[in-house]
Amino acid sequence: MVIIVIDDGVDWGGRYALRNIRINKIKKCALSESSVGDVMTTTQAATQEELVAHLFRRAGFGATPSEMESVKGMDYEEVVDKLMDFSSPDVFPTDFISRFHKDQSDLRLAEAAGAHWVYRMVMTDTPLREKMCLFWHRIFATAGTKLIQHRVIVNQINMFRERGVGKLDDLLVGLSQDPAMIMWLDNQDNHGSNINENYGREILELFAMGVGNYTEDDIKDTARAFTGWTVVNPEYMSIKMRNNTVRPYGYISWQYEYDAEDHDQGPKTILGETGNWDGEDAVRIICDQKATAEYIARHLYHFFVADEVPVPQWPHQGPRDETAIKLMVDSYFNNGHSIKSMLETMFKSDFFKDESTRYARIKSPAEMVVGTMRLAGPIKLPSDETYYAQSVCANMGQGLLRPPSVEGWQGGSEWINTGAYVERINFASRILNDSDKEGVKDLLTRIKNSSGDGTLTSDWLVEACLAVLGPIEVAKTTRDRLKIYASKYGN
């Protein structure tokens, strides 16, 4: 049976969902999450198992049956702590991959860099770390299209892995010193004698505070604070990067440099504080603002809890759950601007566990693609599957390392249109049609073994698939249609 992964519910796939079912020979079984255009009808309190499945969908890319079994018997809070344990680094066979895929030796090209990240997301043992990389990539949107090589964006993602759940101040300093961001927003052209406002504007408007919480003078003086934050010899290094190949040069890139002689040493007033500020001072002042905490909290809610209105509407429309935002803001200030503390507060909160949020957001293309691949089982090398996966993400509107603009992706209902919906169905069908994959074998075995007395019916088949894929709940109309289709075409 095929149930197509969409978002945090299951959208009725009609004949697409059951087209290849045979009750006596189950052909496919694919996870989906969506309730687009369909109202969930469940009213009972969530069970422990349902809450844990919900947590895995949000804090990761969903859970395989084996992952669910690995936390059986643990309290919900213990599962949260387990998912938030980032002490062990992921280990990947990068040497083997780069030998088979020459373009992954230096990751210059978009396709290779995107495939590299897909592999890490699928194979990671710490999915929340990769999920946070997606989160920051969505906010601090930086595209390789302007940057000669996509490896510089890969390096930025690595910085998110190191700082993405730490102190916001440290993350923003790392972002401000990141060569990809410097060149993306032209801070190499931001001089003490002639400022360029691009980065000063975006760190306030898009990255940290949001529209309406600063003035034009704040933008100018923030830009002045970041004068001298540049890269070493940008023109020369750009030429070398364009001439760079896998052999004989290896990987050449920009390196951050602070040029004290190019820094504006005059007094600056940023958000009401005056002094001879530099970039680190500007970050400290920004991170001390309540508006910053509220902005980051709302992004976290939008990404992990429930779809909000698009970000450009935030100045005109309040948050979906003001109490939730306040809880995360309090956690931010009570724990030294810690993003990890905000995440822990969110995942352990009543608002996160509430049934009204369990099926209240649409998966991004990357979440859907990676979740499906993790369900199907580990990637066996060598494989071109990750190249296909990154191209599917792009076809559905989320080219990894290639956001459409500095505003990133808005998400929510914008992920779903006719073309993207078909892409999701086709991708899930292709990946889960391979019965040689370990995860697919496991799913089929579990579904077959769940029949108990051996009686095979359409009702049993639908319920067995929903149970083994989560468990996940669907709208009554979805369940009824799936059962009708299974009854008609399942034998």
What are these regions (language model features)?
Residues 2-6:
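Extracellular beta-strand-rich recognition modules
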Residues 42-48, 52-65, 289, 293-335, ...:
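Flexible, low-complexity segments enriched for small/polar residues
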Residues 26-29, 36-37, 110-117, 149-379:
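Active-site substrate-binding loop specific to GH73 endo-beta-N-acetylglucosaminidase modules
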Residues 65-163:
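N-terminal accessory alpha/beta regions
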Residues 7-8, 16, 38:
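Acidic/polar hotspots within intrinsically disordered regions
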